[in-house]
């Protein structure tokens, strides 16, 4: 990142640009700033200031240490909202999350999933809607699974049922 970018880029820009964070979508500033979406999150006023202000020194990374967790938990909420589902739908359709390694699934696009909604329990996995299995992603990511949660694929496909594979339909 050049110094001119540092002065115009927020912590969110810096964080999303880190290799391995490509599963995340950008949570809009208005969503992040909405106090309803911050309910239950600790230190929100201090962390909000950090993640929305321009990054002075990208090498400083996490100033308090909780920014990644805080953004991840806001992200988990956002991807369940309409705008977040639309953003994740675009990424899903492009195949940004990878494809199922199971040969019988014929390179089915996958979705990110967390095995727990609790921070620090596991890293993100990919979920195949065809075989209903979870796998380690091929991409080099160490994102916490709580950034997506265990129910995200179920919510995604229940709200976008036309994306489920015909093989999932018991009538076929």
Swiss-Prot record:
Identify the tissues in which this protein is expressed.
Answer: Probably not expressed in wild-type flies. In males lacking the Y chromosome, it is testis-specific and constitutes the main component of star-shaped crystals.
| GO MF term list | protein kinase regulator activity
Q: Which Pfam families match?
A: CK_II_beta
Domain of life here?
Eukaryota
Induction, per UniProt: In wild-type flies, it is strongly down-regulated by double-stranded RNA (dsRNA) interference mediated by Su(Ste) transcripts. In males lacking the Y chromosome, the absence of Su(Ste) locus, relieves such down-regulation, explaining why it is strongly expressed.
- SMART domains hit by this protein: CK_II_beta
Extra information: There are multiple copies of the stellate gene in fruit fly, encoding proteins that are extremely similar, which makes their individual characterization difficult. Thus, most experiments probably do not discriminate between the different members.
Please give the function described in this protein's UniProt entry. Unknown. In males lacking the Y chromosome, its strong overexpression leads to the appearance of proteinaceous star-shaped crystals in the primary spermatocytes causing meiotic drive, possibly by interfering with normal casein kinase 2 activity.
The family note in this entry says:
Belongs to the casein kinase 2 subunit beta family.
Listed name of the protein = Stellate protein CG33247
Per the UniProt record, the lineage of the source organism begins with: Eukaryota, Metazoa, Ecdysozoa, Arthropoda, Hexapoda
């Amino acid at each position: 990142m050049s110094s001119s970018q540092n002065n115009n880029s927020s912590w969110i820009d810096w964080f999303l640009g880190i290799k391995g964070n490509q599963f995340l979508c950008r949570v809009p500033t208005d969503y992040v700033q909405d106090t309803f979406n911050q309910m239950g999150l600790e230190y929100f006023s201090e962390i909000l200031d950090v993640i929305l202000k321009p990054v002075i020194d990208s090498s400083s990374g996490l100033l308090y240490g909780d920014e990644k967790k805080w953004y991840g938990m806001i992200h988990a909420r956002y991807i369940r909202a309409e705008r977040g589902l639309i953003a994740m739908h675009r990424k899903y359709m492009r195949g940004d999350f990878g494809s199922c390694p199971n040969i019988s699934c014929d390179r089915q696009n996958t979705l990110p999933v967390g095995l727990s909604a609790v921070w620090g329990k596991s890293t993100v996995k990919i979920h195949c809607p065809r075989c209903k299995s979870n796998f380690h992603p091929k991409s080099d990511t160490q994102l916490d699974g709580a950034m997506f949660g265990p129910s995200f694929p179920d919510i995604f496909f229940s709200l976008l049922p036309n994306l489920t594979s015909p093989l999932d339909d018991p009538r076929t």
